[in-house]
Structures are given as C-alpha cells and as structure tokens.
Curated annotation (Swiss-Prot):
Transmembrane segments: none annotated. InterPro entries: Mopterin_synth/thiamin_S_b, RnfH, RnfH_sf. Disruption phenotype: Deletion of the ratA-ratB operon has no effect on bacterial persistence on rich medium for this strain, but does affect bacterial persistence for E.coli strain CFT073. Does not function as an antitoxin to the upstream RatA toxin. This is UPF0125 protein RatB. It holds the Pfam family Ub-RnfH. Belongs to the UPF0125 (RnfH) family. One of its GO terms (cellular component) is plasma membrane. It comes from the Bacteria.
C-alpha cells in the first residue's frame, strides 16, 4: 500500500484498554490518527485540549507526524500529585 501507513491508537482505563488500528495517509498527524480511531466518539471523557498524548511513551504534540507502526497513546490526567503522595508516604513511615 504505497502512501498508506498503519498506526495504533491506545487509551487505557484501570478497568479497560482501548487499542484501535487505523490506516492513514503518509504525513498524517497524531490528531488525525486519534480522530480516525473513533475513540473520541466512543469515550466522551477524552478532551484533546486537556489530555496529553504521546508516541510510544514519549510526549508528542497533536501536530506531530506519525509513522508506520507507531502507537499513539492518549494519557489520562493525574488524579494526585506524585510528589505529594511520596511526601505523605515518607511522613507515614517516619511516624511508625
């Protein structure tokens, strides 16, 4: 298939993982891959103005190009600040 690339789009929740394979034109962007996957219609909690995205665990912009075989990942927002959680655990273990 000249001019076409295959890309996976992933979105994971604690209880379920979504992994969609899409075929796009060469030069397609991260945003185009996400829209083609149908995940925005399937999961209304995904907001591309708020959710961060990446390609194989590396941060990416919606305007970045995707390549054949890439896995585009949509990240959920953090529920708690990791630094704060570490501080609380350290305090708790110090009080034992």
């Amino acid at each position: 298939m000249p001019g076409k690339i295959a890309v996976e789009v992933a979105y994971a929740l604690p209880e379920k993982q979504y992994l969609q394979r899409v075929t796009l034109q060469e030069g397609a962007t991260v945003e185009e891959a996400i829209r083609a996957s149908g995940l925005l219609e399937l999961r209304t909690d995904i907001d591309l103005t708020k959710n961060k995205v990446g390609i194989y665990s590396r941060p990416a912009k919606l305007s970045d190009s995707v390549h054949d075989g890439d896995r585009v990942e949509i990240y959920r927002p953090l529920i708690a600040d990791p630094k704060e959680l570490r501080r609380q655990r350290a305090e708790k273990s110090a009080n034992k």
